[in-house]
């Protein structure tokens, strides 16, 4: 997924969410709509913002508690523990960061209906600070209001439309087949009948190869197993940028900048590298566009198509292209790695998914566009993986209007967070939540507003269709070609680094299927 946002390993208390004051209720609605009657209880029952439970009065003491619990690496667990302690809604303030936190799908529906015409998320203060420092334009990730809506609609109507994604499937397929070929070559080089490895960096290279092919219409040949310093520097800088962001959501970047702290230096340096590397592709594609030298039979790339449209000036296009490029690497790669890990841990599920793929291949004669429409269980693997390992552990919105959540009156302008990680592991929302079971998405369980790994509404992940297509196509080909295994005794848990990542290397064994 390309969506990046803030703020959840296992339930500390898997039993009840009930507290003396708050009973965890899902408020089901038969037609899944939220009427004004269901949103606005009588004045007699309505409570105020100050009545919401939570540790929000001692905000600076909370900083100490947050640090002591290693909150920067365990924000997902911190959030989960708070839901267990306070119930389905709690209020929190840590330093300057204040939010109302919710977990119910029905409350997520209300939150969605209250986001207004220009949905606004938490401001990524360090990213804004960097762009202000370097006098860079804001891209679609950081824009708000009318400017955001205008830019988003232009992007939505280009590459990110469903019709455009189908046009790009051959490009995805080409890169994915090269990746599969690379794995086969590694098996041959290993002089055994399998290859055992941590795929992290190879998946990063795959994601960079795909997104650059789409954005610039050009292959980088990153899957040739040759060390290439510039792309690797870009990949490493993305990781550093993510890692250095969380602390500056609680401590103002201006303070860290004023003392020239190491974390600020790392953050600025990583963004400098990201912009520098992206500019090499952007400027080359821009020159080709001006010279009209692009091969008219090849896919020209999103950049060229946006330039041809002329709806946005180049600097605005550049800003959003860099947003998309920087958000497409770790996010999609990490989700794919979690998928492989879970399928390796559950060989019976892997076998069923492989059978579905083989049957689809036979029916469609291997046509990738048709195959993408013929693998419902594999698509449920994506959903189930994002349930347990959401890229972003929460979705945030500043409410556009006064809203009622759990009988509390929440004023317009309040930041509300929906805890995705906590929701995915809640037994009152998902039956046997610790069990990896993709078929739950096929078997009649209520899934309304439960698959939110890409967000919701007009501000959901802009690259959702690209990410889903890339992940499903990759898994189609990998499971056709390889049996995936892992050490059953090694348990990998989650760590928060702005996105949710593995806390240790995921070592997998790939054995070619004869």
UniProtKB/Swiss-Prot annotation:
Catalytic activity field: 6 reduced [adrenodoxin] + cholesterol + 3 O2 + 6 H(+) = 4-methylpentanal + pregnenolone + 6 oxidized [adrenodoxin] + 4 H2O
Keyword annotations from UniProtKB, A to Z: Cholesterol metabolism, Heme, Iron, Lipid metabolism, Membrane, Metal-binding, Mitochondrion, Mitochondrion inner membrane, Monooxygenase, Oxidoreductase, Steroid metabolism, Steroidogenesis, Sterol metabolism, Transit peptide
Biological process, per Gene Ontology: C21-steroid hormone biosynthetic process; cellular response to peptide hormone stimulus; cholesterol metabolic process; cortisol metabolic process; glucocorticoid biosynthetic process
Topological type in the membrane: Peripheral membrane protein
Transit peptide: 1-39
Disulfide bonds, paired cysteine numbers: none
Binding residues for heme: 461
Cofactor(s) in the UniProt record: heme
CDD domains named in the record: CYP11A1
Keyword Transferase applies: no
EC number(s) on file: 1.14.15.6
Predominant cellular place of this UniProt entry's protein: mitochondrion
Enzymatic class: oxidoreductase
Pathway in which this enzyme or protein is active: Lipid metabolism; C21-steroid hormone metabolism
Keyword match Cell membrane: no
A Pfam family it matches: p450
Gene Ontology CC, one term: mitochondrial inner membrane
A GO MF term: heme binding
Database matches in PANTHER family: CHOLESTEROL SIDE-CHAIN CLEAVAGE ENZYME, MITOCHONDRIAL, CYTOCHROME P450
Task performed by this protein: Catalyzes the side-chain cleavage reaction of cholesterol to pregnenolone, the precursor of most steroid hormones.
Similarity remark: Belongs to the cytochrome P450 family.
Protein name: Cholesterol side-chain cleavage enzyme, mitochondrial
Gene: CYP11A1
